[in-house]
Amino acid sequence: MTTFADLDSTHLDAVVEINNAGYPAVPNTTRAELEQLAKVCSLAWVVLDDAGEVAGFVMAVNPGADYDSENYRYFESHYRNHLYIDRVVLGDSLRGQGVGTTLYAQVFEHAAQAGRDFVTCEVNLEPPNPGSLRFHHRQGFEDVSTQATKGGSVVVQLLAAPLGAVS
């Protein structure tokens, strides 16, 4: 049975490995960078597979955080009461099993309990990540804007889901 748990330091090496296996859909990162991100996050969960091994994760940031991300700054200026999903990656072994939908339902519940109005995120358009974009649309996310980041090397679709969008 797949379970969710709070991310802690014992999970970081596995999280870095899963994250970097998702490149270019998510940026490659180091353990130190993920440790810094975890300090900013209000929500950081791992997805554990049937054997109890880390097979995915999600990291999200509350409004008002001291976080220097081009995409987060966009949402801060347009959606003041939002939970921003900075990173979500599921390993190949979990794909197509409904785990992503279950994970997002939990994220939406967490955001609603915290009094948030929206859950926000971005998905790469360049380099393309069409599967993720389709998944997010199915979860109730709406396209709100696009922007070039990382000096123009990445173009993202900015997405927002009003709470209550997922049944």
Residue map of PLM features:
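Conserved catalytic-core motifs of GNAT/GCN5-like acyltransferases
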Residues: 122-124, 137-156
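A short, internal acetyl-CoA/4′-phosphopantetheine-binding micro-motif in the GNAT/acyltransferase core
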Residues: 76, 86-95, 124-125
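A short beta-loop-alpha structural element at the N-terminal edge
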Residues: 1-15
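Active-site rim helix/loop that mediates acceptor-substrate recognition in acyltransferases
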Residues: 24-51, 59, 65
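C-terminal "cap" of GNAT-fold acetyltransferases
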Residues: 77, 146-167
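Conserved acyl-donor/pantetheine-binding loop and adjacent beta-alpha core of acyl/acetyltransferases
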Residues: 59-87, 151
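Conserved GNAT acetyl-CoA-binding A-motif
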Residues: 111-125
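Conserved acetyl-CoA-binding loop-helix of GNAT-fold acetyltransferases
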Residues: 90, 96-109, 138
